[in-house]
Amino acid sequence: MEIKTEIEINASAENVWKVLVNFPDYGSWNPVITKINGMPYVGEKISFNIKAAPGIEVPIPLCEILVASAASKELRWKGPAIPIASDVLSGEHYFIVQEMAPNKVRFVHGEDFTGLAAGALKPLLQDRLTDSYNEMNRALKAR
């Protein structure tokens, strides 16, 4: 199951990238991923909090950074890094900043889900996560 969203942002690719990899600042602008512990380096283990509903934050443990490329402006992480849990449901979350013009980018934000429960959870997750990712995209654009 894949969830994929896009938004055009009137900013340079470099500026959008700087916001994405500034994990300590997520709580000040991101309404969905409200906190990230760790650094944006390949192989680094991160954990983060997501806002599941008003007043409800869910901790997501032990995701591994797979790609963190300033050159291609791509950030990906996969989790959870718990072997039994990843057989049931695992997601590869991604952000890609595509330069369209000097001060205009396409921000691609999505997640590929795999595991035994991925298909069964699609009706529950598809619309909710698409809405959440679009909410984050709009907040990034406003930043």
Residue ranges of each PLM-predicted region?
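Hydrophobic ligand-binding cavity/cleft-lining segments
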Residues: 1-41
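Intrinsic-disorder/low-complexity, polar/charged segments enriched in Ser/Thr/Lys/Arg/Asp/Glu/Gln
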Residues: 2-6, 45, 74, 92, ...
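Hydrophobic/aromatic beta-strand elements that line small-molecule binding cavities or substrate pockets
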Residues: 5-7, 61-68, 91-99
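Solvent-exposed residues in well-ordered beta-strands and their adjoining turns
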Residues: 8-12, 49-51, 98-100, 110-114, ...
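Short strand-connecting beta-turns/loops that link adjacent beta-strands
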Residues: 12, 41, 70-72, 100-103
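Short solvent-exposed loop/turn micro-motifs enriched in small/polar/acidic residues
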Residues: 29-31, 58-59, 88-90
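Glycine-rich portal/gate segments that line the openings of hydrophobic small-molecule binding cavities
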Residues: 37-86, 138-143
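Beta-strand/loop substructures that line and gate deep hydrophobic ligand-binding cavities in soluble
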Residues: 81-135, 140
